[in-house]
Curated annotation (Swiss-Prot):
Organism (species): Mycobacterium tuberculosis (strain CDC 1551 / Oshkosh)
Bias (Basic and acidic residues): 7-21
Annotated catalysed reactions: N(6)-carboxybiotinyl-L-lysyl-[protein] + acetyl-CoA = N(6)-biotinyl-L-lysyl-[protein] + malonyl-CoA; N(6)-carboxybiotinyl-L-lysyl-[protein] + propanoyl-CoA = methylmalonyl-CoA + N(6)-biotinyl-L-lysyl-[protein]
Name of encoding gene: accD5
Keyword set includes Ribonucleoprotein: no
Name the record gives this protein: Biotin-dependent acetyl-/propionyl-coenzyme A carboxylase beta5 subunit
EC number: 2.1.3.15, 2.1.3.-
Length: 548
């Protein structure tokens, strides 16, 4: 209910609006104030209420929720589209459907844009696209991370090819910024058509479960063309892109969870490729490593099972090596490999680890591509890479071969061999065959290679090797009527004792040290300090030819 006082105030405001004299300084200021107020709610309060009714925030509220309080500086708030086709000239909301600007997160500068689905459905037109291009170029020029909050429905059809041209400019800027500044995309609604390619070109994609979707063609088009019936969530929801496509790096439980994840993610990343990632002050330990062991360090000595075929959770190793939290990336995708960020001695590191609880830690197509992308991300932004290895090989099967395990597995080889950041490898158990080479071997350019006494470094495991190495002996025994199974077990044990251990590799320098598991954190810490001034020189080239 509106009071008499409120009605009087509103009448006064309307009177003021009608009597603004834009030929005076006071009038010009009043006109600016009016336009700025209008830009806050370009399509009215009803649209805002509808957004809130869905449990969502508006484009502007999302920026406020992510950035430090009162840090946002808006750009192009008064921009309007210039199109007159299809009666668009009768509706020209301020901002044209996207809020752009810059601010801070934990005191660090970032550039940002947030798409507004209440304005033309969040569709991209000429001015909308120009605003995004402008803030992209500002981020590149100033060396600041760029965060895009996406909630739009493709190109603005009424504006025709100009929308497609702006998409292309946005995509090109994503490419130019790649490896120069961190680019993070949050998907907060249904992103379709051209709206999905820009996020796909960025470093990290965060989605919200049951709220955000990404797809090129929607369910209606798919049904018309192929006859398939699928919901938006099944087609392009957060779970789909986390577990199946690998497009999403994190599936948030809600919008605030997504913002919290971005804030934590940025704490591990530098503002650009010319600087180092932020570190926390941590005093270097004094004295020998064995005099600085913690209870968590000592727990590593009993973590590996006696049986080489019994799995263990590699997360148990990771959490005991890091200072505090482990920020896992793509946790729901290719779970046979674990990647993410943490800190050791206050320094950010990227962890790449085989996971014995999934496919026994074997590398497959998805795991290879997941790890390769993460390794390249770390290398872009000067983050040391720590490999934790327990890999019996590449996953066998016709499905893997037909779908390109040779070419796609080579991506991890390429990414690791090309990386120039400090590279440290710890072999916890199995390191067999070609997978040993891929997972940070000495001759692939690893700087410091460590192995636990439980490490098994060989061309293949004992059960497979016996059939090759002792083929003639087994055949003769079979012809003589001997117990083949008993002989095979004895030969397997002989092979394991001779070759399946870390000491042959250590004798030849493929392993720099065989260490107690409890000493691992200390060794990694000293290696990181040593490699801080690592100098890497690569042959001059335009760019390499990654096996895409």
């Amino acid at each position: 209910m509106t009071s008499v006082t409120d009605r009087s105030a509103h009448s006064a405001e309307r009177s003021t609006e009608h009597t603004i004299d834009i030929h005076t300084t006071a009038g010009k200021l009043a006109e600016l104030h009016k336009r700025r107020e209008e830009s806050l709610h370009p399509v009215g309060e009803d649209a805002v209420e509808k957004v809130h009714a869905k449990g969502k925030l508006t484009a502007r509220e999302r920026i406020y929720a992510l950035l430090d309080e009162d840090s946002f500086v808006e750009l192009d708030a008064l921009a309007k589209h210039r199109s007159t086709n299809f009666n668009l000239g009768e509706k020209r909301p301020l901002g044209d459907g996207v809020v752009t600007g810059y601010g801070t997160i934990d005191g660090r500068d970032v550039c940002i844009f947030s798409q507004d689905a209440t304005v033309f459905g969040g569709s991209l037109g000429e001015v909308y696209g120009e605003k995004i291009v402008k803030v992209q170029e500002l981020a590149i020029k100033t060396g600041r991370p760029l965060i895009g909050i996406n909630d739009g429905a493709g190109a603005r059809i009424q504006e025709g090819v100009v929308s497609l041209g702006l998409y292309s400019r946005i995509f090109r800027n994503n490419i130019l910024a790649s490896g120069v500044i961190p680019q993070i995309s949050l998907i907060m609604g249904a992103a379709a058509g051209g709206h999905v390619y820009s996020p796909a070109l960025t470093d990290f994609v965060i989605m919200v479960d049951q709220t955000s979707q990404m797809f090129i063609t929607g369910p209606d088009v798919i049904k018309t063309v192929t006859g398939e019936e699928v919901t938006m969530e099944e087609l392009g929801g957060a779970h789909t892109h986390m577990a199946k496509s690998g497009t999403a790096h994190y599936a948030a439980s809600g919008e605030q969870d997504a913002f919290d994840y971005v804030r934590e993610l940025l704490s591990y990343l530098p503002p650009n490729n010319s600087t180092d990632a932020p570190r926390y002050q941590a005093a270097a330990p004094t004295g020998p490593i064995e005099e600085n062991l913690t209870d968590e360090d000592l727990e590593l000595d009993t973590l590996i099972p006696d049986s080489p075929n019994q799995p263990y959770d590699m997360h148990e190793v990771i959490t005991r090596l890091l200072d505090d939290e482990f920020l896992e990336i793509q946790a729901g995708y290719a779970q046979n490999i674990v990647v993410g960020f943490g800190r050791i001695g206050g320094r950010p590191v990227g962890i790449v680890a085989n996971q014995p609880t999934h496919f026994a830690g074997c590398l497959d197509i998805n795991a290879s591509e997941k790890a390769a992308r993460f390794v390249r991300t770390c290398d872009c932004f000067n983050i040391p890479i720590v490999m934790l290895v327990d890999v019996p090989g590449f996953l066998p099967g016709t499905d893997q071969e037909y779908n390109g395990i040779i070419r796609r597995g080579a991506k991890l080889l390429y990414a690791y061999g090309e990386a120039t950041v400090p590279k440290i490898t710890v072999i916890t158990r199995k390191a067999y065959g070609g997978a040993y080479c891929v997972m940070g071997s000495k001759d692939m350019g690893c700087d410091v290679n460590l192995a636990w006494p439980t490490a098994q470094i060989a061309v293949m495991g004992a059960s497979g090797a016996v059939g090759f190495v002792y083929r003639q002996q087994l055949a003769e025994a079979a012809a003589n009527g001997e117990d083949i199974d008993k002989l095979r077990l004895r030969l397997q044990q002989e092979y394991e004792d001779t070759l399946v251990n870390p000491y042959v590799a250590a004798e030849r320098g493929y392993v720099d040290a065989v260490i107690p598991p409890s000493h691992t954190r200390g060794y990694i810490g000293t290696a990181l300090r040593l490699l801080e001034r690592k100098i890497a020189q690569l042959p001059p080239k335009k760019h390499g030819n990654v096996p895409l």
